[in-house]
């Protein structure tokens, strides 16, 4: 086989659907105001960083992580009010948990369903596992279309339904009554993705043991620990036991576990940061809504989705912001319902003022 050109080898070895994909894009943020990834803009205080450094120094790196970490599980339960009776599974970010759920539940050709547009990885993880993804379009106002969702559940009988609460990238928080109807209709598992729960003031976590076909999935990425890559899944122990069977051995490295344990001893710091972003969201939304040709959608996350329908479209506004070294996420070409939409993370007051000032200049030029 020597002498065969690399592209030909790749074509023989790599799945056609993988070759057709593009890698997830991450913009170079050097020197920029970064409002494109829903990260917390605040660095941890010095005393927290000192505890992290101490924990890292004391962590042995020559041994694999323990299969279970009861002390960290107890910390996570207390910090995030996970019911004592619930099973708990850690993942290398919620992305890994999405993979584990689909791998455990879906045979090739089985259906994974979600309102759409939503978190793009629901679709990607399904397709990577040879499952069929069904996205049920939101309404023109980017609200949940409950009748269409229930009809799709009846028609496709999905093994897994993902509900992002609040939804990303739109920011909408679906009503409890609608979620209840989906839980009652779904023939398989319903995953309640609460990645943005700290900014929504609403959760299904206290009720999860009352829901035999649901689990709650969360991440620490949005509350100041995006670099840590830590997610957790809570639900009936029987569900968690099945997902644990497909978890890669040693999936959570010892440093991530040690750092999280150190940070959770300062949980009020994380709560205060989330509260601040929650408080700053509405002023940012109001400032955007006051701009000419801009429509702002209600958000329960740490971001605001805005549509630009004036003399400049979303692509042009995105490029103009980028030339000013302000990064926001452009969804203009991602889905017809998101035409001309930009998603702007809530930053510091200074960053929020900067993006509003830049947009004022761009739209009035």
Swiss-Prot record:
Listed pathway(s): Amino-acid biosynthesis; L-histidine biosynthesis; L-histidine from 5-phospho-alpha-D-ribose 1-diphosphate: step 7/9
Keyword Transit peptide in record: no
TM region(s), chain numbering: none
Annotated positions of the N6-(pyridoxal phosphate)lysine modification: 222
Catalytic activity as recorded in UniProt: L-histidinol phosphate + 2-oxoglutarate = 3-(imidazol-4-yl)-2-oxopropyl phosphate + L-glutamate
The EC number(s) this enzyme carries: 2.6.1.9
Subunit structure: Homodimer.
Family designation: Belongs to the class-II pyridoxal-phosphate-dependent aminotransferase family. Histidinol-phosphate aminotransferase subfamily.
Identification of the protein by name: Histidinol-phosphate aminotransferase 2
Gene name of this polypeptide: hisC2
């Amino acid at each position: 086989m020597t002498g065969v050109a690399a592209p030909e080898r790749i074509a023989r070895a790599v799945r056609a659907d993988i070759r057709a994909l593009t890698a997830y894009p991450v913009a170079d943020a050097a020197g920029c105001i970064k409002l494109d990834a829903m990260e917390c803009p605040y660095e941890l205080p010095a005393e927290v960083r000192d505890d992290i450094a101490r924990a890292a120094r004391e962590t042995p790196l020559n041994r694999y992580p323990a299969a279970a970490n009861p002390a960290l599980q107890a910390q996570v339960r207390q910090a995030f009010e996970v019911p004592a009776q619930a099973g708990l599974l850690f993942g290398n970010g919620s992305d890994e948990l999405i993979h584990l759920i689909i791998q455990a539940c879906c045979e090739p050709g089985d259906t994974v369903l979600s309102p759409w547009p939503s978190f793009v990885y629901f679709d990607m993880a399904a397709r990577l596992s040879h499952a069929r993804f069904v996205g049920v379009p939101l309404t023109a106002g980017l609200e949940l279309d409950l009748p269409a969702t229930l009809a799709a559940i009846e028609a496709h009988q999905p093994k897994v339904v993902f509900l992002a609460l609040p939804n990303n990238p739109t920011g909408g928080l679906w009503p409890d009554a609608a979620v209840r109807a989906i839980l009652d209709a779904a023939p398989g598992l319903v995953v309640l993705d609460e990645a943005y729960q700290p900014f929504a003031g609403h959760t299904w976590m206290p009720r999860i043991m009352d829901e035999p076909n649901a689990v709650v999935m969360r991440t620490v990425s949005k509350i100041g620990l995006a670099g840590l890559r830590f997610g957790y899944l809570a639900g009936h122990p029987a569900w968690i036991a099945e997902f644990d069977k497909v978890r890669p051995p040693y999936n959570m490295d010892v440093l991530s576990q040690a750092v999280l344990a150190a940070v959770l001893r300062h949980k009020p710091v994380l709560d205060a940061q989330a509260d601040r972003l929650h408080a700053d969201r509405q002023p940012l939304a109001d400032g955007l809504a006051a701009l000419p040709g801009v429509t702002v959608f209600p958000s329960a996350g740490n971001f605001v989705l805005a549509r630009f329908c004036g003399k400049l479209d979303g692509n042009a506004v995105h490029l103009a912001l980028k030339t000013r070294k302000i990064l926001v996420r452009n969804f203009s070409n991602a889905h017809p319902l998101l035409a001309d939409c930009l998603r702007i993370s809530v930053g510091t007051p200074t960053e929020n003022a900067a993006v509003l000032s830049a947009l004022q200049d761009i739209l009035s030029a």
